[in-house]
Amino acid sequence: MSSEEAKVVVPRNFRLLEELERGEKGIGDGTVSYGMDDADDIYMQSWTGTILGPPNTAYEGKIFQLKLFCGKEYPESPPTVRFQTRINMACVNPETGVVEPSLFPMLTNWRREYTMEDILVKLKKEMMTSHNRKLAQPPEGNEEARADPKGPAKCCVM
């Protein structure tokens, strides 16, 4: 039996539980983190991530919040990744905050063994590249989270 045939494919939910456990323990130097967005999400689809802006870049001193959505095909297919915090970066749609797969090779060339941690670390490295590191960022007063794409929440006051 070759090593290819012996490779075990870990089911989606077990894989996500492994990622959750790793995210809760903390990652590397602490400049990226992630976890479940909603503890009641039994399908483990909605995740939140954080990247601390790297030093000596236009992102320094800022905390960037992201949403990652792992559809039913994850980890065979990549999650969708969207910055909640406004950011000016070559691979990010400035209107929606979506990380464009066509501009972020890791998503275009997705492999099953990649993780959400890998995405966050790669985005942080992307912030440090020559074409991103000096990009002017949105003004300070503009750090509020992006509006929910589902529209405003409706509320009643009685």
From Swiss-Prot:
GO cellular component, one term: UBC13-MMS2 complex
Tissue: Expressed in roots, shoots, leaves, stems and flowers, but not in pollen.
PROSITE patterns (alphabetical): UBC_2 (PS50127)
Annotated spans, Disordered: 130-158
InterPro entries: UBQ-conjugat_E2_core, UBQ-conjugating_enzyme/RWD
Gene disruption phenotype: Plants do not display MMS sensitivity during seed germination.
SUPFAM superfamilies (UniProt xref): UBC-like (SSF54495)
Pfam families, per the entry: UQ_con (PF00179)
One GO biological process term: postreplication repair
UniProt cross-references to SMART domains, sorted A to Z: UBCc
Domain UBC core, residue spans: 11-158
Protein family per UniProt: Belongs to the ubiquitin-conjugating enzyme family.
General function of this protein: Has no ubiquitin ligase activity on its own. The heterodimer with UBC catalyzes the synthesis of non-canonical poly-ubiquitin chains that are linked through 'Lys-63'. This type of poly-ubiquitination does not lead to protein degradation by the proteasome. Mediates transcriptional activation of target genes. May play a role in the control of progress through the cell cycle and differentiation. Probably not involved in the error-free DNA repair.
Subunit-structure text: Heterodimer with UBC35 or UBC36.
Protein name as catalogued: Ubiquitin-conjugating enzyme E2 variant 1A
Source species: Arabidopsis thaliana (Mouse-ear cress)
Gene designation: UEV1A
